[in-house]
Amino acid sequence: MSKIEEAKKKASETAVEDWLQLSVAFDGADEVDESLTLIKGGGGCLLQEKIVASSAANFIVLVDERKCSKKLGTQWTKGLPIEVVPMAVKPVQIRIKEVLGGDPLLRPAGTKMGPQLTDNGNFLLDWHFDPQANYDWRKVEDTLLHMPGVVETGLFIGMTRKVYVGNLDGSTRVLGE
């Protein structure tokens, strides 16, 4: 076993209790709206990122100004990431279209054949929704999470109280408290 494989094995065996009480966690986001609701998961690691964010007393987000929007879906146009167990992809796609509309597309792997796998071995759907519609994101998330086969969504609602924004001119600003 290589050193990298050993490190990965050790990290995967680390008990959540060992790091469950983080005082602060920092991360980026794919998009943040005016109410500090985030879309994350563009890189495919949304479940584990949500576990870390929810385990931190303070979850602080860092973005550049191009990721800020009045409404979700206007800057990040690649869809809302949804982690789904492989056998449920088709039923979940059909259900999303029936209940929420839009177009939930299976995310392809970038450098190999087939769909992209999450770190947990699941597939990702990218739900392309109407960015002009007025969504209650808590209801959307609840609807998605109650679909059999959906593991997690890329919606991070009420998880951060502060977003640090780097502006293109080099200045910074803080959204939130």
Please provide the spans of the model-predicted regions.
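Glycine-rich helix-loop-beta junction characteristic of Rossmann-like nucleotide cofactor-binding loops
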Residues: 15-20
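Conserved phosphate- and dinucleotide-binding cores of soluble alpha/beta proteins
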Residues: 2-10, 22-177
